[in-house]
Amino acid sequence: MSLPKDLLYTEEHEWVKADDGSYVIGITDFAQDQLGDIVFVELPEVGDTVTKGDSIGSIESVKTVSDFYAPVTGKVVAVNETLEDEPELINSNPYDTGWILKLEEVEEADVKALLSSDDYEKVLD
């Protein structure tokens, strides 16, 4: 299982990457593996303000439907529209082309509360 060291993580298996003033968010390799083949992704709307811990969309796989939670509070400035036609990108490349959304105006305290890759690895053990 792949676990990039330059990302931050949540115990709910989301990842967060700082990207020049904004934050890109997706689900981890562990999460996509647990879900199985992803067939549909419900995304939030650009312009929405999301609150840490709130459900902001869902991911449907052949096994189940799971809510996707905001790992930090912020404003949605982009969603990965490619996932509408190719949701399986989350399975094949969860940390790159399978990203889900991008936030700005993020609460710094929320970012500081995220887990390092080493701490997230302990959650998985």
From Swiss-Prot:
Cofactor: binding comment: Binds 1 lipoyl cofactor covalently.
Cofactor requirements of the protein: (R)-lipoate
Residues found modified as N6-lipoyllysine: 63
Top-rank taxon, per record: Bacteria
Matching InterPro entries: 2-oxoA_DH_lipoyl-BS, Biotin_lipoyl, GCV_H, GCV_H/Fam206, GCV_H_sub, Single_hybrid_motif
SUPFAM superfamilies: Single hybrid motif
One cellular-component annotation, GO: cytosol
Domain Lipoyl-binding as annotated: residue spans: 22-104
Pfam families in the cross-refs: GCV_H
Matching Gene3D superfamilies: 2.40.50.100
Keywords for the protein's UniProt record, in alphabetical order: Lipoyl
Example GO biological process: glycine decarboxylation via glycine cleavage system
UniProt feature coiled coil, ranges: none
Function: The glycine cleavage system catalyzes the degradation of glycine. The H protein shuttles the methylamine group of glycine from the P protein to the T protein.
Record-stated family: Belongs to the GcvH family.
Subunit structure and binding partners: The glycine cleavage system is composed of four proteins: P, T, L and H.
HAMAP family according to UniProt: GcvH (MF_00272)
UniProt-recorded name of the protein: Glycine cleavage system H protein
Organism in which the protein naturally occurs: Listeria monocytogenes serovar 1/2a (strain ATCC BAA-679 / EGD-e)
Lineage: Bacteria, Bacillati, Bacillota, Bacilli, Bacillales
Gene: gcvH
